[in-house]
Amino acid sequence: MRITVLALGSRGDVYPLTALAAELARHGHEVRLAASLNLVDLPRQLGLDVVPVGWNQQSMMQTERGREWVTKSNLDSFLQITIEAYRDYGRRFGDEAIELTAGSEAIVCAVVSEQWAAALAEAYDVPLVAYDLTPSRPNDVVPHPLVAVDPLPTAAANRATYLHYTRRAWRYRRDLMFQFRRRLGLPEMPPPPKQLRRPLELQGYSPTLVPGLTWDAYRPIVGDLRLTPVDLDRAGMSTLDPELARWLAAGEPPALVTFGSTHVSDPAAMMAAIRRVCRSLGLRALVATGWGLSGLAPSTSPELRVVPYVDYDLVLPHCAMVVHHGSASITAAGVRAGIPTMVCSSYADQPFWGRQLERLGAGVHVRFTDLSEDVLLSGMSRLTTGPLRRRAAQLGELMRAEPHGTPVAADEVDRYLAA
């Protein structure tokens, strides 16, 4: 079957769908992957048919407006800035998406592109598969992660947050989507869901991390999507970099610190704070600069190593703790490794994951805007305590016992498309 996968956003958005695309290709499907233009190297290494598209979230987040975007905790402000970013690119992506999906027999997407993908699937009358990194469909247990990060007192209240988000989000995106739907020859307003083919909505998170959710067959919990051992080997990512492996083996397990795509206004000052905090706690530090600390050059000393990126699943089992921004992928990898986590969250689903780890007893959560050297020291000190370490180890055992999410997701897609 000809499948187009729309993978836009940051690494945490694109790489899970890259893993799924590779697995679907191995199942015999003819897969085309549309990926953000700055994140096409990995899918190319996997031999996928990849088409770069113009959305470059890294560049956007390095602008003044992008930096403001990740600091907004108010839903309306966050949505307004999101749509401003989409407005410039949305029309161009619409052209790209129409061309890319022409002739497709199914479309796969994540939340970043779901509005476009749903309209395309409606226009072409083909199945739609959506991938949720975080619980984002109405349920009784957890509220919408952009509305509230803690469960509300009643099931009805939790469910109501999804309607609230949908109404607020539609207010900001409707003009853009009206234009796109008109270009597809569709009425401006989508028809009621009962008149459309029901999509498959893969729930891409661990039931260990979000317990208590039950869905029907159209919303299977598959776990987080990551590269399979076969694809890790194909991409040359199945073993640690030899120099990093030697550094890890030369001392005590370090703290991994990364802020991913979160902009750090003064990388040198942040690095100095990390160095002092780790020294006071007797820890070595492995710092992955990502986008947020990209101004820092790689360096190595016995107590501190700075690298651009690491493969979380390879590195974290060698670490004592992890401090990160709260993306779904690194949250899952840290818990799977059985180590405690400090989440310094900024936007989107990051606060949800930070609070979820606190509720599970395996982590500490602070807002990135509140992060100081004292806050970092306090949080990392808590990660050295017995209760958090024991709970993290327990959750790690549970997660490692779960099946690998990517083959499970591909099997669910096959079943859905064959129905």
Regions found by a protein language model. Give the residues of each.
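Short loop/helix-cap segments at secondary-structure boundaries that form the rim of catalytic
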Residues: L39-L46, A118-A123, V141, L209-Y218, ...
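Conserved nucleotide-sugar donor-interacting segment of glycosyltransferase catalytic cores
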Residues: D88-R159, P207-L209
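Short glycine/proline- and acidic residue-enriched helix-loop micro-motifs
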Residues: K72-A85, A156-R168, L395
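Phosphate/nucleotide-donor binding subsite
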Residues: D49, V53-E105
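Short gly/pro/ser/thr-enriched loop/turn and capping motifs at secondary-structure boundaries
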Residues: V40-D41, Q57-M61, A130, T134-V141, ...
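Nucleotide-activated sugar donor-binding and catalytic core shared by glycosyltransferases
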Residues: M1-R11, Y15-A34, N38-D49, R159-R171, ...
